[in-house]
């Protein structure tokens, strides 16, 4: 991944590469840019807001994990705080294609897990597929969301998805990323399970009530969480494992370093992620233990 970032730097305009290199090559770079850093880059490069976001896409695509398609897609969302979050597509050998994560989903869930309660705009390499348009329509900010493509004028999400079907059609008022804090607790004192409960309390599952969260522990002790992101159209829903795996990659870590996983689900939910979680992790590494709790 670092080599891909270095390649992106080599291909970027000199003024951008010079200013960006110390940021993206730093050991603590977390695939985000603060509003202040973005403003500094605008000033140093004389690029417009749109031009700079498009120029940053190769750096987001550097995080892509696409062993099947070898098609590397990047996306960048701007949270309500003004911070920019990178995302990239993610695929898995030996697992059915429904487990794939698109770049738009990656960037959005990245922002969500880092505390954003909505996104203002999204910048992507290629026109969003129907799956992602539907996924974005679940967002708390869907009505205001702007979509930017290279060499295109900015458009609203609903210009890409007219006459959209969404949460309101099913009587749901709260969207994905809306500020929420469920009150689930678990008697099991295992630290990884407690981290999964924290993720569960962020989750969005108004259609099945399968509020759920997952935590992954790496060999170096780092822990990454994923909350379930359900969708009114069902199929574009993003499972908690995928949300957590996205955080692993965007932190510059690898799947090889996953040491353990914990999944916590609402006992009153109408579905379960357990079987798919186990099968996907087994494809990555059959030795990863999975703890599971219903609360």
UniProtKB/Swiss-Prot annotation:
One of its GO terms (biological process) is cytidine deamination. Gene3D superfamilies: Cytidine Deaminase, domain 2. The keyword Zinc applies. Substrate binds at residues 89-91. Zn(2+) binds at residues 102, 129, 132. It comes from the Bacteria. The active site is at 104 (proton donor). Its cofactor is Zn(2+). GO terms for cellular component: cytosol. Binds 1 zinc ion. The keyword Cell inner membrane does not apply. Keywords: Hydrolase, Metal-binding, Zinc. It catalyses: cytidine + H2O + H(+) = uridine + NH4(+); 2'-deoxycytidine + H2O + H(+) = 2'-deoxyuridine + NH4(+). NCBIfam families: cyt_deam_dimer (TIGR01355), PRK09027.1 (NF006537). Homodimer. Belongs to the cytidine and deoxycytidylate deaminase family. PANTHER family: CYTIDINE DEAMINASE. HAMAP family: Cyt_deam. This is Cytidine deaminase. It comes from Vibrio parahaemolyticus serotype O3:K6 (strain RIMD 2210633). The gene is cdd.
